[in-house]
Swiss-Prot record:
Organism per entry: Candida glabrata (strain ATCC 2001 / BCRC 20586 / JCM 3761 / NBRC 0622 / NRRL Y-65 / CBS 138)
KW Nucleotide-binding (keyword) present: no
Gene (name only): ERV25
Name of the featured protein: Endoplasmic reticulum vesicle protein 25
Similarity comment: Belongs to the EMP24/GP25L family.
Membrane-related topology note: Single-pass type I membrane protein
Record-linked InterPro entries: Emp24-like, GOLD_dom
Subcellular location: Endoplasmic reticulum membrane; Golgi apparatus membrane
Length: 208
């Protein structure tokens, strides 16, 4: 339910704004999002500041499969990044702000505005409206239709994923059950062998 609610609210969520302090040994700050196979992803970035202001801001965009979509070194201002996801996966937008000790001070930082759009949100609806000569109400209905299709596809993906996990769980349970039966058989056989061995040993010593 929460996932569905986020999908419905996604078109109304404003861009993410934050400050990233410059450090001599910076750690990457990453924002993670998820995308389905074949979906268009558009990332818009805007920063304040200027080159040589003591901040060396770097950007890395990559997914969990190891694909890298963009790498920017010492950038400032507006940047637009677009790519089509080769598979259903998560991707990270990572920032790294290094302090230039020769030009900056310990309070150096960059204000960053980040907006990530995917699927129907990432499409150029103005161009589509002009090309297909859609009226405003038709354009809104088209947006709703595509968003609904995306929600249905996402729900189907979650359903299929749940089925795969259930099958894996059932297979694991079956292997554990078979292993438990095998252990019981081995322990029973070992116990019987020990009893027989002790019986023969005591007989040989004329104890019994």
């Amino acid at each position: 339910m929460k996932f569905l609610l986020l999908l419905l609210l996604a078109p109304f969520i404003s861009a993410l704004r934050f400050d990233l302090k410059a450090e001599s040994k910076p750690e990457q700050m990453c924002i993670r999002d998820f995308v389905s196979e074949g979906e268009l992803v558009v990332i818009n970035i805007d920063t304040d500041g200027s080159l040589n202001d003591g901040n060396v801001l770097n950007l890395y965009v990559h997914d969990s499969n190891g694909n890298e979509y963009r790498r920017l070194k010492n950038f400032v201002g507006e940047q637009r990044i677009a790519f089509t996801a080769p598979a259903t996966t998560s991707f990270d937008v990572c920032f790294e702000n290094t302090l230039d000790s020769n030009r900056g001070n310990r309070n150096a930082k960059r204000a960053i505005e980040l907006d990530i759009e995917s699927g129907s949100q990432a499409r150029d609806w103005n161009k589509i409206s002009a090309t297909e000569k859609l009226r405003p109400i038709e354009l809104e209905l088209r947006k709703i239709e595509e968003l609904t299709d995306e929600i249905v596809d996402e729900l189907n993906y979650l359903k299929n994923r749940e089925e795969r996990l259930r099958n894996t769980n059932e297979s694991t349970n079956e292997r554990v059950r078979n292993f438990s039966v095998l252990v019981i058989i081995v322990l029973t056989s070992l116990g019987a062998w020990q009893v027989n061995y002790l019986k023969n040993y005591f007989k040989s010593k004329h104890i019994i």
